Amino acid sequence: MNHLKSFFTALVAGFILTACSSLDISDTRPADVKTIDKSDIQWQQHLKQIKQIQHYSSQGQIGYISSKERFSSRFEWNYAAPTDYTLKLYSTISSTSLVMQMHNTGMTISDNKGNRRSEADAKALVREIIGMDVPLEQFAYWLKGQPDEKADYQVGENHYLASFTYPLDGTVWSADYLNYHEEKQPALPKDILLKNANQTLKIRVDNWTF
């Protein structure tokens, strides 16, 4: 088990050396964002359309920063259900890749060299092997710009989700939606900044399929 953990640690470290150029997304949350009321008709119509997207995939780049880890990589995300999704992290420079696959009995993490590890507790496995402590259950909704309607969220003047804060597991996550693919129907996020007190995720989505 220790050998496998060491291998994955080295694998993630490899992303630091071989990853794409750093994302040009600021670490700082934007200030003075103009917002509109949540009852806005265009926002409510947009939210309804977002909710109807149940199965989707996206590709882009992700940057992760914490006191223990710092890396940037390409990603492919495929989502079908809370117990059926896959996140692949990979480098375009080398053959390095890592796949997190959720299934009915938990999560399996594997790499391009055939190493794999499965556990029922997906979040604990990701934390142990990769060092990331991210809210996997919520990520599928946050990525497409769908807030928890009971949470504190703001709608921008563009009639899309601008930001939200969400308390979870003793910490508070914030999300800022900096740019959208407005050529899509419905418009879907392009640049996202996710933060809590100890972690920062920068996400740039290049392509959406649904």
Swiss-Prot record:
Subcellular compartments: Cell outer membrane
Signal peptide: 1-19
One GO cellular component term noted in the UniProt record for this chain: cell outer membrane
Main location: membrane
Keywords attached to this entry: Cell outer membrane, Chaperone, Lipoprotein, Membrane, Palmitate, Protein transport, Signal, Transport
GO BP annotations listed: lipoprotein localization to outer membrane; protein transport
Membrane-protein topology: Lipid-anchor
Lipidation (S-diacylglycerol cysteine): 20
SUPFAM superfamilies: Prokaryotic lipoproteins and lipoprotein localization factors
A Pfam family hit: LolB
Lipid-linked residues (N-palmitoyl cysteine): 20
InterPro entries xref list: LolA/LolB/LppX (IPR029046), OM_lipoprot_LolB (IPR004565)
Self-association state and partner proteins as the record states: Monomer.
Main function: Plays a critical role in the incorporation of lipoproteins in the outer membrane after they are released by the LolA protein.
HAMAP family named in the record: LolB
Family, similarity comment: Belongs to the LolB family.
Listed NCBIfam families: lolB
The name this protein goes by in its record: Outer-membrane lipoprotein LolB
Biological source species: Mannheimia succiniciproducens (strain KCTC 0769BP / MBEL55E)
This protein's encoding gene: lolB
